[in-house]
Amino acid sequence: MRMTSGPDGGQRRFVALASRPATLIVVAAVLLLGTAAGVMAALTTDGSSRCQQAFVPAYFYAAGTWSQADQAKPSVMILDISGLGAGSAPVPHFRSVVSQAQAAGVTILGYSSTAYGLRPAAAVEADARDYKAWYGVTGVFLDEVQGIARELPYYRQLASYIHRVSPGAPIWLNPGGYPGRSYMSVGDVVMVFEGTYARYRDAPVPQWASHYQPARFAQTIYATSGAQLDRALRLAWSRQAGYVYVTNRSGSNPYRALPGYWTREVAAIGADCSRRVASAAKADAESRRPDPGDSGLSLGWACDRGHWRRHCGHLAG
C-alpha cells in the first residue's frame, strides 16, 4: 500500500501498488448492539440511527487479525481484489470469504477506485458488474472521489449504472473530506474525513451537513493515542458521523492492523449506543403515559376549562 496525494496536494488515500498480489480490503461497519431487537431499537422509523457504528478499513490479510475484527459482528464489508477493483477474474478464495460473511448476515460492498474522476467510467462500471456476478456483492464503495461540481456528472453516471445492475444497491463515496452538497444525492454514505487526530480537532464542518442524518456520514481518524480515543469518538458523533473508525496506527498505512485499543473502542461505542437507546426508550415511554386525571383530558385542557380542583389542584403551592 502507498499514500497518494489528492488533487489538492494533500495526502488523501491509500491504494495498492499494481504489482502487489491480490489483497482483501475490508471495511467492517459494526453494529454494536448484539441482537436484532437492539438493532431495531436503535433505528428510528425513517431509517436513521441513534447510534454510532464502528467500521474497520481492514487493509490486512492475516487470518488472526481478520478473526479479531470479525468477532465484533461486522454488518458491512468492502471487498477489494486488486487495489483498484474487482480484478480480471474471480478469485475462489474470496468467493469463499464472501459466502461465509453473507451467511453470517454481512452486507458486502465491492471496492472501486475512481482516481478522482480520472479512471474511465467503463472500468468502474465493469467493477460493479463483475463484483456482483463473481461475488454477489450488495453494493459498491467508490474510492478517491473528486467531490467537485465539475465531476458530478461522472459520479452520477456511475451511480445510475450501479443501480441498473443492482437496483437499490447501497453506494458509499470516499472523497476524504466534505464534497459539494450535490454528492449527497449520489452516495448513501459519504466518508467526509480521513486524516490524523491533529487535523481532526479543528476540521471544519459545513452548515449543510446538519440537515442529514448521521447514518449518511463516515469518518476515519488515525494517529490517535489511547488518551485521545474517547474525545475523538465524542467529536465524531457531535459532527454527525454515524460511522467512525479511530486508530492509533499511523505512517504510510495506518490500516495495516487493528487499533491497539480495538477492544476498548468497540466497548466505548457499544456503551454509548446502549445509553442512547435506553434514553430514547425512556423518552418514548414518557410520551405514551396516560394524561393526568380520569377524564382522559390533557392537563392543559382541564386547567383551561376550569377543572382546576379535580385535575390541577395538586399543583397549587
Protein language model features and the residues they cover:
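Secretory pathway export signals and precursors
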Residues: G47, I269, L299, G306-W308
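Hydrophobic alpha-helical membrane-insertion segments, chiefly the h-region
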Residues: L32-A42, R309-H314
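Short, hydrophobic alpha-helical membrane anchors of single-pass surface/secreted proteins
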Residues: A22-V26, G296-W301
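Terminal targeting segments of Actinobacterial cell-envelope proteins
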Residues: M1-S19
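Extracellular Ser/Thr-rich, low-complexity/disordered mucin-like segments
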Residues: R288-S298
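Extracellular/mature segments of secreted proteins
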Residues: S279-A285, S295, W308-H314
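Sequence contexts marking disulfide-bonded cysteines in secreted/extracellular proteins
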Residues: R50-Q52, S274, A302-D304, H311-G313
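Glycan-processing catalytic domains of CAZymes
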Residues: S19-T23, G34, M40-S287
